[in-house]
């Protein structure tokens, strides 16, 4: 087989793997202001549910074909609004015929509520609904929420999250701080305010943007000379909330125009990176403390010829984790 054909095969394999790894967690189809469209695979072929809590629309919930019988995923924690009415938006919802939800204790042994949703509207394939959670929950106690969407073919899609009823708005304040911190890293002047949280040390590794923490330099935190631009869509999720301590995650894409430097890419080619920021925050009446922070960055492999050097593949910026191999259908090539 000619070298050109080998490169084409390897490129196709890596593009497929990269799409699954980077784009699946960020939704089936998202478009940012750069005009680049990303499409995910697999479970996201089902309708996608976007809950609203803490004053904003949060990261999407992806559907499962089967009801989870034992425990729910711990990816998302939703703090209920004061009236316990939880708004959701369902993308690609034109396949949905009926919608209901159930609430169980976290050990799944006790059914607290099961309700058919009637308060919903549909327009252009998108559903806006409200889950009218009843006054049956113990405050400051997490429960398992399962949303069942019955589709036009008679099958069901299940969506899971944890829910919590609380009297304080500390989580919303901490989410606002995380979003503000993230936004300011893209603006050098306003980012000066972030030095309050930083703990820069000479021993920190400032040689790569793959992983950045509070111990890195200010230049590293503010993207150095990369010249990246963030897309308009930022997915936020509350991972944990225990008293005044919260763990929050932001996911988004950044793009940059390649300059033809390291990596051999031609000028003008748009490079795309998946970015995840994780914050551990502690609320107090005086201020919010940042207990831990980590930003990881992975380049989305495009498969262009410039990213191949002989038998090597130039993967660009990466956090050093999550590199997988995949074989071609014939089993002859591994990438």
Please tell me what each predicted stretch does:
Residues 40-101, 109-111, 142-150, 154-225, ...:
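Core segments of small alpha/beta cavity-forming domains
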Residues 27-31, 71-87, 96-124, 129-147, ...:
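Surface-exposed, charged secondary-structure patches
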């Amino acid at each position: 087989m000619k070298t050109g054909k080998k490169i084409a095969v390897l490129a196709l394999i890596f593009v497929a793997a990269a799409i699954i790894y980077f784009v699946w967690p960020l939704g089936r189809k998202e478009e940012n202001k750069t005009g680049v469209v990303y499409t995910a695979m697999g479970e996201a072929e089902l309708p996608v549910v976007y809950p609203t809590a803490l004053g904003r629309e949060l990261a999407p919930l992806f559907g499962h074909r089967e009801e989870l019988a034992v425990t729910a995923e711990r990816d998302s924690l939703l703090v209920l609004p004061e009236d316990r009415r939880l708004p959701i938006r369902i993308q690609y919802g034109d396949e949905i015929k009926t919608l209901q939800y159930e609430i169980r204790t976290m050990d799944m042994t006790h059914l607290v509520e099961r309700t058919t949703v009637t308060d919903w509207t549909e327009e252009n394939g998108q559903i806006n609904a409200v889950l009218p959670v009843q006054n049956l929950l113990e405050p400051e106690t997490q429960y398992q929420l399962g949303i069942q969407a019955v589709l036009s073919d008679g099958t069901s899609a299940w969506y899971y999250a944890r829910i919590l009823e609380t009297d304080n708005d500390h989580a919303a304040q901490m989410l606002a701080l995380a979003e503000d911190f993230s936004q300011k890293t893209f603006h050098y002047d306003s980012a000066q305010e972030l030095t309050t949280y930083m703990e820069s040390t000479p021993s920190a590794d400032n040689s790569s943007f793959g992983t950045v923490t509070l111990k890195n330099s200010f230049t590293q935190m503010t993207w150095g000379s990369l010249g990246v631009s963030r897309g308009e869509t930022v997915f936020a999720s509350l991972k944990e909330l225990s008293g005044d301590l919260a763990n929050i995650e932001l996911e988004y894409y950044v793009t940059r125009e390649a300059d033809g430097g390291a990596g051999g890419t031609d000028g003008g080619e748009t490079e795309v990176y998946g970015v995840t920021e994780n914050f551990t925050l502690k609320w107090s009446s005086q201020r919010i403390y940042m207990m831990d922070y980590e930003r990881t960055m992975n380049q989305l492999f495009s498969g262009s010829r410039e990213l191949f050097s002989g038998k090597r593949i130039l993967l660009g910026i990466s956090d050093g984790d999550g590199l997988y191999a995949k074989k071609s259908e014939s089993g002859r090539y591994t990438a």
